[in-house]
UniProtKB/Swiss-Prot annotation:
Biological source species: Pseudomonas putida (strain ATCC 700007 / DSM 6899 / JCM 31910 / BCRC 17059 / LMG 24140 / F1)
Keyword Repeat listed: no
This protein's encoding gene: gpmI
Protein name, per record: 2,3-bisphosphoglycerate-independent phosphoglycerate mutase
Binding site for Mn(2+) 1: 400, 404, 460
Cofactor section: Mn(2+)
Function comment: Catalyzes the interconversion of 2-phosphoglycerate and 3-phosphoglycerate.
UniProt entry keywords in alphabetical sequence: Glycolysis, Isomerase, Manganese, Metal-binding
Length: 511
């Protein structure tokens, strides 16, 4: 007969970061006797919930989706942008078999490498550093003919800001001693996603056959001429740079956008044998057409960075080991504690139950800062007393949702409501011999005013988040923890070996 579970409860205080600055800090201002007592008597510390520690670019504030994905996965979950940037830094990019294979085929036949992509530092669809790295990879592997077909931004960047990006790539090619920008066109044409095929055809014909409305000796001259025609970056018309460059049989074509939605239409024109959206004057027999990421499972093009599937996330691993689990949150954060915490899976795992508590129907949550936290807590206390679950994962939305309103007094009340709720959970756990981990997904409520502008600060922060152990074990919190370490910590408390897929390590160590 199995022993009665004494639940391990993971309490996620959404948007509840830590700052040592007391001004405009709703946590500091709140009357929170339970939280203060736990920090004084229980093992506690801080863990990171932002930037590269959660798979985002350096200095990027965390968010709820990324936070819960990392919490549940037990490993840092890298976004495509970050995966590519990290691979470039680590050197893995230059050994990527999909990229090197395409370049080597072209080089072996004495053919050209064509690089397509949004030339921008916007970081939404692409990043110019990735295009620089691709040019370097091609040169390192012996390509003599390297051509960049640059799509100009002006949408995720200022409308006329392409000059510095063009200068960067010109300097890159000069340093490599080979390669050049072969064409310019605005993203309005090359990156359509609304089936405006006349726009896409302009980009396709420019790249494949050097068919252009305008020509220029250099990319900078082409840009200046476009500005003189009153075309901002996004709308620059097809411009051939220097001698005509065509995509010939045996050439390799590599599309360096990492975001899929605006890369699909042009890619279809290059790779679909029965393409009918516009009449292609010519379809070269390319050695390879590569997407930096998978643009669509229906587009027959290899991806240099294939989609990463998350196996053995916490919920799945608990189910495999016969453990029961409860996920509970109010409406605002229900998807986070279920779908995102489960690594992008909609369906519950075996032995998993879910409780959704409706969020209050108010215009803004500063009008009801306690939100539905008391009702959520009622159900958690009930579940603890029943002792049906090995693990309970709860999200409290207050810190984030009230923090987003920018109303300081309401944020203080939200923190005080949370303190009462946490106290009720801790009391219930003590009666049954259970344990809890208290943490957050990212910061917010600890900074309610922008120190530069003096205006309300309604966004997330890059501050670390608390990590508190509640229980009887003689442990301490190690330095350097991140959100991805939380799931391995839970498995350690449950007496389970972590799966190989979880690269995080326990935050709790023997005292």
């Amino acid at each position: 007969m199995t022993s009665t579970p004494k639940p391990l409860v993971l309490i996620i205080l959404d948007g509840f970061g830590h700052s040592d600055i007391p001004e405009h800090n709703a946590i500091f201002a709140a009357n929170k006797p339970v939280y203060d007592r736990l920090c004084a008597t229980q093992p506690h510390g801080l863990i990171s919930g932002s930037g590269m520690d959660v798979g985002l670019p350096d200095g990027q504030m965390g968010n709820s989706e990324v936070g819960h994905m990392n919490l549940g996965a037990g490993r840092v979950v890298y976004q495509d942008f970050t995966r590519v940037t990290k691979a470039i830094r680590d050197g893995e990019f230059f050994e990527n078999p999909v990229l090197t294979g395409a370049v080597d085929k072209a080089v072996g036949a004495g053919k050209a490498v064509h690089i397509l992509g949004l030339l921008s530092d916007g970081g939404v669809h692409s990043h110019q550093d990735h295009l620089v790295a691709m040019a370097k990879l091609a040169a390192q592997r012996g390509a003599e003919k390297i051509y960049l077909h640059a799509f100009l931004d002006g949408r995720d960047t200022p409308p006329r800001s392409a000059q510095s990006s063009i200068e960067l790539l010109d300097a890159t090619f000069a340093k490599l001693g080979k390669g050049r920008i072969a064409s310019l066109i605005g993203r309005y044409y090359a990156m359509d996603r609304d089936n405006r095929w006349d726009r896409v055809s302009a980009a396709y014909n420019l790249i494949v056959d050097s068919a252009a409305e305008y020509t220029a000796d250099t990319a900078l001259a082409g840009l200046e001429a476009a500005y003189a025609r009153d075309e901002s970056d996004e709308f620059v018309k097809a411009t051939r740079i220097g001698d005509a460059v065509k995509v010939e049989d045996g050439d390799a074509v590599i599309f360096m956008n990492f975001r899929a939605d605006r890369a699909r239409e042009l890619s279809r024109a290059f790779v679909e044998p029965d393409f009918t959206e516009f009449a292609r004057a010519r379809l070269p027999k390319m050695a390879a057409y590569i997407g930096l990421t998978q643009y669509s499972a229906k587009i027959p093009a290899p991806a240099a960075f294939a989609p990463s599937s998350l196996n053995n996330v916490l919920g799945e691993y608990l189910a495999k080991n016969g453990k029961t689990q409860l996920r509970i949150a109010e409406t605002e954060k229900y998807a986070h504690v279920t779908f995102f915490f489960s690594g992008g899976r909609e369906e519950p795992f075996e032995g998993e139950e879910r409780i959704l508590i409706p969020s209050p129907k108010v215009a803004t949550y500063d009008l009801q800062p306690e939100m539905s936290a008391p009702e959520v807590t009622d159900r958690i206390v009930e579940a603890i007393e029943q002792q049906r679950f090995d693990v309970i994962v709860v999200n409290y939305a207050n810190g984030d949702m009230v923090g987003h309103t920018g109303v300081f007094e309401a944020a203080v009340k939200a923190v005080e409501a949370l303190d009462t709720c946490v106290g009720r959970i801790v009391d219930a756990l003590e009666k049954v011999g259970g344990e809890a981990l208290i943490t957050a997904d990212h910061g917010n409520v600890e900074q309610m005013e922008d120190e530069c502008t003096g205006q309300a600060h309604t966004a997330h922060t890059t501050e670390p988040v608390p990590f508190i152990y509640v229980g009887k074990r003689n442990v301490k919190v190690r330095e350097g923890g991140v959100l991805a370490d939380v799931a391995p910590t839970m498995l350690k408390l449950l007496g389970l070996e972590k799966p190989v897929e979880m690269t995080g390590t326990s935050i709790l160590v023997d005292a």
